[in-house]
């Protein structure tokens, strides 16, 4: 009786657990460290960048609808979506990919913490603050978390010459294991796919 109850409880709590792996500390060349530091230091207002205001409004309305079940507070949803679009575009990433990463990493929970200690929406490991940031950077702060997550993912995509599968494995600390990259790619291409302009 106890084992089935425990299994049911674990299954029910699965969406509350963060998938975040343990991003692995790797020494960075000074030029790479400098580039990533500049990316996470930006404090400009998170303004969405689209070819036209109408394109931006269509994207925001569609993503707002898709995210409603996961984040009931509309103001919080819109703030997250605007910041995702801004930080992803700055890092030359598809905002839809970033939404897929957030879904798998933290299930859209701002204060998620993995067993390895990764934090926030994009499950960033604290060592990155010492490596490329400043001591006051709070990884639970929306813009800070997204700036770090997008900069790190861009870095791994550059290392892997655009290979999403390998870059996502690096991001999660599970390079060579298929489960995490497949989960993110499925979320990106199925739940977050958007055929209109994303930036």
Which sequence ranges carry the predicted segments?
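Boundary at the C-terminal end of the N-terminal hydrophobic targeting segment
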Residues: 16-22
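Short N-terminal segments immediately surrounding and downstream of signal-peptide cleavage
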Residues: 22-39
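Low-complexity, intrinsically disordered short peptide segments enriched in small/polar/basic residues
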Residues: 14-16, 29, 37, 121, ...
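Bacterial N-terminal signal peptides
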Residues: 7-15
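Positively charged n-region of N-terminal signal peptides that target proteins for export
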Residues: 1-4
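Catalytic glycan-binding domains that act on GlcNAc-containing polysaccharides
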Residues: 42-199
């Amino acid at each position: 009786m106890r084992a089935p109850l425990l299994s049911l409880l674990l299954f029910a709590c699965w969406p509350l657990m963060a998938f975040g792996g343990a991003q692995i500390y790797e020494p960075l060349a000074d030029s790479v460290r400098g580039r990533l530091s500049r990316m996470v230091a930006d404090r400009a207002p998170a303004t969405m960048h689209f070819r036209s205001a109408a394109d931006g409004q269509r994207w925001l309305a569609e993503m707002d609808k898709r995210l409603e079940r996961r984040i009931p507070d509309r103001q919080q949803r819109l703030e997250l979506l605007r910041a995702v679009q801004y930080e992803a575009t700055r890092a030359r990433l598809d905002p839809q990919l970033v939404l897929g990463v957030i879904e798998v990493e933290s299930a859209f929970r701002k204060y998620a913490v993995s067993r390895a200690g990764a934090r926030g929406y994009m499950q960033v490991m604290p060592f990155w603050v010492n490596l490329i940031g400043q001591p006051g950077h709070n990884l639970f702060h929306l813009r800070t978390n997204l700036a770090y997550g997008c900069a790190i993912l861009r870095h791994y995509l550059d290392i892997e010459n655009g290979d999403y599968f390998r870059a996502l494995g690096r991001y999660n600390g599970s390079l060579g294991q298929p489960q995490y990259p497949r989960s993110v790619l499925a979320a990106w291409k199925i739940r977050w796919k958007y055929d209109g302009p994303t930036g």
